[in-house]
Amino acid sequence: MNRGIPFRHLLLVLQLALLPAVTQGKKVVLGKKGDTVELTCNASQKKNTQFHWKNSNQIKILGIQGLFLTKGPSKLSDRADSRKSLWDQGCFSMIIKNLKIEDSDTYICEVENKKEEVELLVFGLTANSDTHLLEGQSLTLTLESPPGSSPSVKCRSPGGKNIQGGRTISVPQLERQDSGTWTCTVSQDQKTVEFKIDIVVLAFQKASSTVYKKEGEQVEFSFPLAFTLEKLTGSGELWWQAERASSSKSWITFDLKNKEVSVKRVTQDPKLQMGKKLPLHLTLPQALPQYAGSGNLTLALEAKTGKLHQEVNLVVMRATQFQENLTCEVWGPTSPKLTLSLKLENKGATVSKQAKAVWVLNPEAGMWQCLLSDSGQVLLESNIKVVPTWPTPVQPMALIVLGGVAGLLLFTGLGIFFCVRCRHRRRQAERMSQIKRLLSEKKTCQCPHRFQKTCSPI
C-alpha cells in the first residue's frame, strides 16, 4: 500500500513533463474596429522554431510547418498573418487586419513547450448621425464593445472641451470651435485605446460683425465659412433692419452651386453687388444714414436641416457744419460704452460723450476730428474743416466785379446829377429871359382884345 504512493507521484510528474506547454499570465490588448492589431509571442531563444496560434476553442489560426506558414480553419484565416522576417529573432507575433467586434477573444500562442494567452478586446466608436452638423445641433457618439466589458470613455474637442461617459456620449449645442478632430480615449483593465473622429461644424467664421464707415464711403460685407467642402450647394438671403425703418426687408437672395454664387433678386434701393465666388461677399455703393442698421444673412445647405446664420451691423458717421454749429452724429447699432467726441486737431477733446450725437457752438477755425472710440481705441474717424465766418476772404475776381459795379453806379449817378443840373440852369435862364422881356415892354395890356378901349399910347 505504501509502495503505491510514490509510484502515483512519479506518474503525475511524468504527465506534467509531457504537457506541450506551460500557461503563463494573460495579457490584455485593446484594438479598434477596422484597424490592425499585433499580438506578440516571443521565444526564449532567438531562433526559428515551431509555434501555433489558437483561439479559445482550440481552433488553429496559424502556425509554422517546416519553413512555411500554415493556416487553420478559423474565421480569421483570411485576415491573420505573421512577420516571417522576425522568426529568426524568436518573435512569432500574429497580426489581425480589419478588426471586428466579434474578434474579441482569448488567443493562445504555443511555443517552446509554453503557452502565452492574449485577451483581445475590440472597440468601435462612431457618430450616430452625419459628422457634418450645423452649429447648434447635437452630436452623439456610441461605443461598440464586446460582451462582458465595462469600458469608460473620455473625449476632448478641438476647443479643449472634455466630456466623459460610458457607452454613449452626447454633446448638445455644437459650437464652431468644436469643428475639427475629436480625440476619444477608451479605457478597460488599465489599458487604453485612442480614437480620432473628424467632426465638421457647418457655420460662418463669425457669429456677428460690425462695419464702421463714414457717410458716402463704399461698404464691404464678407461672410467667410468656417469649413470647406468639395461640393457646396444651397441658397441664401440677406434681411436688413434699418435703424430708421419700422420693419425689416429682404435686400438680396442668391443661389450657391458648386461654390459659385448667382443672384436671384436684389432691391433697387440700395442696389447691392455680390461676388460670384466664395467667400460670400456683398458691396454697398454708399454708406448713408438711412442704411445704418442690422442684417441677418441665412444660408440653407442642400440635404441639411436648418440654416447657417451670421449677423452684420452697419454704423455710419456724419460730421457737418451749419451756421455757427459743428455736429458729429452716428447711426446704427452701437454699444452704450462707445464714446463720441469732437476735437480740434492737435488739441484735447472739446466735447466727449457716450451718446450718438455731439456738437460745438461757434467752433474755432481749423481741422476738427469726429471720433467714435471704444476704451481708447478709435473705431471710426471723420475730419471736417471749419473756416472763419468773418471777415470772409474775397477773391480777386469778386473785387474786379465789385469795382466795376461801383464805377458804373458812380458814372450813372454823376450823369444823372449833371443832366438834372443842366436842365435846372436852362429853365432858370428861360425864366430870366422872360422876366427881362416883360420889363422892357411898355405898360400895355397883356390881352389887347380885352383892354383895347382903355389902352392908348402915351
Curated annotation (Swiss-Prot):
Phosphoprotein recorded as keyword: yes
Q: Which residues lie on this side of the membrane: Extracellular?
A: 26-396
- Record note on modification: Palmitoylation and association with LCK contribute to the enrichment of CD4 in lipid rafts. Phosphorylated by PKC; phosphorylation plays an important role for CD4 internalization.
Which residues are annotated as modified residue Phosphoserine in the UniProt record? 433, 440, 456
Which chain positions have S-palmitoyl cysteine-type lipid attachment?
419, 422
User: Its Gene Ontology molecular function terms?
Assistant: coreceptor activity; MHC class II protein complex binding
Q: Where are the transmembrane segments?
A: 397-418
GO CC, sorted alphabetically, is:
cell surface; plasma membrane
Q: Tell me, which GO biological process terms does this entry list?
A: adaptive immune response; cell adhesion; T cell differentiation; T cell selection
Please list the residues annotated as glycosylated. 296, 325
Q: Could you say which residues form the signal peptide? A: 1-25
Q: Which Pfam families match?
A: C2-set, CD4-extracel, ig, Tcell_CD4_C
How does the record classify its membrane topology? Single-pass type I membrane protein
- Fetch the Gene3D superfamilies from UniProt: Immunoglobulins, transmembrane domain of human cd4
Q: Which residues lie on this side of the membrane: Cytoplasmic?
A: 419-458
Places the protein is found:
Cell membrane
- Specify the Ig-like V-type domain's residue ranges: 26-125
Report the SS bond pairs.
Answer: 41-109, 155-184, 328-370
The segment(s) forming the Ig-like C2-type domain are 126-203, 204-317, 318-374
Q: Which UniProt keywords apply?
A: Adaptive immunity, Cell membrane, Disulfide bond, Glycoprotein, Immunity, Immunoglobulin domain, Lipoprotein, Membrane, Palmitate, Phosphoprotein, Repeat, Signal, Transmembrane, Transmembrane helix
The written remark on domains in the entry is: The Ig-like V-type domain mediates the interaction with MHCII.
Question: Per its database record, what is this protein's job?
Answer: Integral membrane glycoprotein that plays an essential role in the immune response and serves multiple functions in responses against both external and internal offenses. In T-cells, functions primarily as a coreceptor for MHC class II molecule:peptide complex. The antigens presented by class II peptides are derived from extracellular proteins while class I peptides are derived from cytosolic proteins. Interacts simultaneously with the T-cell receptor (TCR) and the MHC class II presented by antigen presenting cells (APCs).
How the protein assembles, per its UniProt entry? Forms disulfide-linked homodimers at the cell surface. Interacts with LCK. Interacts with PTK2/FAK1. Binds to P4HB/PDI. Interacts with IL16; this interaction induces a CD4-dependent signaling in lymphocytes. Interacts (via Ig-like V-type domain) with MHCII alpha chain (via alpha-2 domain) and beta chain (via beta-2 domain); this interaction increases the affinity of TCR for peptide-MHCII. CD4 oligomerization via Ig-like C2-type 2 and 3 domains appears to be required for stable binding to MHCII and adhesion between T cells and APCs.
What protein does this entry describe?
T-cell surface glycoprotein CD4
List the source organism: Macaca mulatta (Rhesus macaque)
Q: What gene is behind this protein?
A: CD4
